Amino acid sequence: MTNPGKTLWLAITCLALGCVWTQAQPSAPTPGQWASGALGQTLDVKVMAPKADSPSHPLPVILYLENLAAPRAGTESDEVILHDFIAAGYLVVTLDYAHNPKARVPWINRDLLALRESLLQKKFLGEFEIDLNHVFIVPAGSRLRRDVVFYREPGRTLAMDIIYPTQPAQPVGAVIEFSCDNQNRMGDGSLTSCSDTLLDGEATEGLAVAMADHPVKAPYKGIDPMPECAWKIKAAVRTLRAAGTTLGFNGKIAPVGFSRGSGMALLLVTTRGMNAFEGRGECTNTSSDVQCAVVMSGRFTYLDLMPEDHMLPRYTKAWGERTNHLEAWRQAGALDYLPQATLPLFLTINCTEGPDAQLQMATLRKRLAELGSDEIFMMDHEPRGHKVSLVPDILSGINIYLKTQLAR
């Protein structure tokens, strides 16, 4: 009998091995162009500013990517979409990829990061006052729905921003991420520092993507209170699924998580079907189930920590001495809710992550193996430390995994 996890792994391996990153040097851009490192050439650029009397200052930005290599998922015309973005007060910038075969995952991810970096450093669109907390990379044929509320608590309303193919020819799956910026979920500085291009990349491949507020308000100190965090992230999944019923989604959702968001992605898997974490937040009559998850470097259990872990004093202050309050420590870890084999997971971590992070990933993998749960694991051998991978094999593997699981 064929093992579906191994079959998927073989497919990912065979396809990913063809993805070799070689960065050609583009010619110097002229006004109206942007230098694409992924393609090794310049792209034609058009900038469309909102009316002078627009109240949006600094300006939120839409980077609208045209003529990508991946099949276009949304069927609504660019003319209508762009008109609406400009009317809503966005500074709209179109970049024409001219159907270059490398204008897709995994190669385009380097461009997606470079675009965000160039805005942050004022090397691109420097003549405009830009709202760096609201820069959205939108593939042609897609729209943006902002500030979709999924949870309310005193002093804070949690919401998400959804980029989705509009009027899709076929229903699409959705990917959700909980931001590593606890203050501004789309903060360009946070996305750039983490080299996080996952949602931007998957949107170019025809999936709907949602960046959600992290369940813990700023400032983040490494403590994820339970059961509150579970209430909030499940409300986010329910809300995304409910929104998708009118936006052309197929009802299948995958969380992806890095750093402080990785435990949230895993928690959605390990607490599937646990009613104790339901009934709070929006859309309580909708399912919070997820169909798969991408889990990167993070903390998954607090029962197996290194003696010199620098966070131990903070955990002890929050939960008491571990020997006397073991259950409180257990309840804080996403992995410790897993009673049996679960969904096949995609796992990855950088080879130069610290020993604490490596131990967490090793512990997660060991537990999955003990339970007989399928996993796909890819080590990132590009020595970049605590970053989301930009390695083509890994990005391609994630993309194939998500498309496969969200189509089932």
Kindly give the residue locations of the regions a language model identified.
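Short substrate-entry loop that stabilizes the transition state in hydrolases
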Residues: 53-59, 65-104, 168-172, 178-221
